[in-house]
Design a protein with these regions (language model features):
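A short, Lys/Arg-rich alpha-helix, primarily the initiator
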Residues: 2-68
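DNA major-groove recognition helix of helix-turn-helix/homeodomain DNA-binding modules
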Residues: 93-118
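Helix-turn-helix/homeodomain-like alpha-helical modules used for DNA recognition
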Residues: 116-200
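Single-residue recognition of alpha-helix capping/boundary positions
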Residues: 43, 103-106, 141
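Major-groove recognition helix of helix-turn-helix-like DNA-binding domains
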Residues: 74-89, 145, 149
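Intrinsically disordered, low-complexity coil/linker segments enriched for acidic/polar
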Residues: 37, 58, 72, 77, ...
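Non-catalytic DNA-binding core/recognition domains of DNA-processing enzymes
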Residues: 44, 69, 84-88
Length: 209
């Protein structure tokens, strides 16, 4: 069974030079400077990593939605997207540049729109996980969930640097699986009422409740 869902973007109008209005739905955080804190950069990259593990064409979908939502003036191409995500200090190819607030907003908007397209898949997988966990059934016995966890582990291990301090708590497959399931919960949170705004705020003032 394939976890992938169709995420084909629609045609859009040309990008305008001013910041897209959709970004105005996310409040500017009360932080010093124009760059995002370390935790914010990590969490945004990880939520996108979970989407890539859910959707085989995740990277292309991110770029497609950037165009659809008129955010391609911010997320211009694959290299530009990689540079933004590489501000995550846990990455092997970490880039020492700030992730600006407007870049972070664009990534969060896209992540939340992708989450909405994948709501049914995310909800089903969390339900399967809960049922299997309650009955103490190994997760690998469910193909859909197993495929997601396997892809997430592969993405995580290939892109994150095990020598980074934040990696030390995630040295086992079980711990990485826990992270993957936790991120599914955050993706579902993004699909709820005012989920995008609430998730955005949580990136700066604490964990999603």
């Amino acid at each position: 069974m394939n976890v992938s869902a169709s995420l084909t973007p629609f045609n859009t109008s040309p990008t305008q030079k001013s910041a897209p209005m959709i970004l105005d739905t996310l409040p500017d955080p009360a932080i010093e400077g124009q760059g995002c804190p370390r935790t914010t950069r990590v969490q945004i990259d990880l939520i996108l990593l979970a989407i890539e593990a859910l959707e085989l064409g995740g990277s292309e979908a991110i770029l497609g939605f950037a165009e659809e939502l008129e955010l391609n003036g911010i997320i211009k191409d694959r290299v530009n997207l990689w540079r933004m995500r590489s501000t995550n200090p846990l990455r092997r190819a970490n880039i020492r540049r700030p992730l600006t607030i407007i870049e972070a907003k664009a990534l969060v908007v896209i992540a939340c729109y992708l989450s909405r397209r994948l709501t049914v898949v995310i909800r089903q997988m969390l339900m399967i996980y809960q049922q299997m966990n309650d009955k103490q059934i190994p997760l690998e016995q469910n193909l859909r969930l197993s495929n997601y966890l396997e892809r997430f582990r592969a993405h995580f291990k290939s892109r994150m640097n095990p020598r980074r301090s934040g990696f030390l708590a995630l040295t086992s497959d079980d711990k990485i699986d826990e992270l993957a399931i936790n991120l599914l919960g955050k993706l579902l949170f993004c699909t709820g009422t005012a989920g995008m705004q609430r998730f955005w705020i949580s990136l700066f003032d604490g964990e999603v409740e």
